[in-house]
């Protein structure tokens, strides 16, 4: 059990800490990441990633090297989009509407979605273990 939040809400962080539930707040500034970590977050969602850059992760890790970061919001299911985030130190990436396209869902084209997921997982595996790519 865990909670993912779209924003860094201190009251939610305090509540989660009090009941022992991990939370993953959404942060868009270094200050928000700092406050989230102060409130017990070990994992932070960088949102919206498409308005930030992988350099943001490197900057955060320069002052908070132990925090794990997940860019979400605008990360595309392509190697060109994913690789810079991993190169900067992202733990993983979050994808929603970029991976599960409305038109594919509306058409019932679940095979296309499944193939895209496999492709993305292959990209990630190659980034995590370059000797096997």
Segments predicted by a language model, with ranges:
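Catalytic cores of alpha/beta
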Residues: 31-39, 76-93
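C-terminal helical cap(s) of enzyme catalytic domains, especially alpha/beta-barrels
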Residues: 16-18, 86, 102-132
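Glycine-rich phosphate-binding active-site loops on the catalytic face of alpha/beta enzymes
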Residues: 7-12, 45-54, 89-109
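Catalytic beta/alpha-barrel core
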Residues: 1-8, 21-29, 33-34, 42-51
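Short beta-strand/loop segments at the ligand-binding rim of alpha/beta enzyme cores
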Residues: 1, 15-24, 63-72
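Short, structured coil segments at secondary-structure junctions
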Residues: 19-20, 39-40, 65, 88-89
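Mobile acidic interaction elements
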Residues: 63-66, 78, 109
């Amino acid at each position: 059990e865990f909670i993912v939040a779209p924003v860094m809400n201190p009251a939610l962080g305090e509540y989660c800490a009090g009941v022992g539930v991990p939370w993953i707040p959404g942060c868009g500034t270094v200050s928000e990441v700092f406050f989230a970590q102060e409130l017990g977050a070990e994992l932070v969602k960088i949102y919206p990633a498409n308005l930030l850059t992988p350099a943001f992760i490197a900057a955060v890790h320069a002052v908070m090297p132990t925090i794990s970061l997940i860019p979400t919001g605008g990360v595309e299911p392509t190697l060109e989009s994913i690789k810079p985030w991993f190169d900067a130190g992202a733990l993983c990436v979050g994808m929603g509407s970029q991976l599960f396209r409305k038109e594919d869902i509306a058409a019932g084209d679940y095979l296309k979605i499944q193939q895209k997921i496999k492709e993305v997982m292959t990209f990630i595996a190659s980034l995590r273990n370059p000797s096997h790519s």
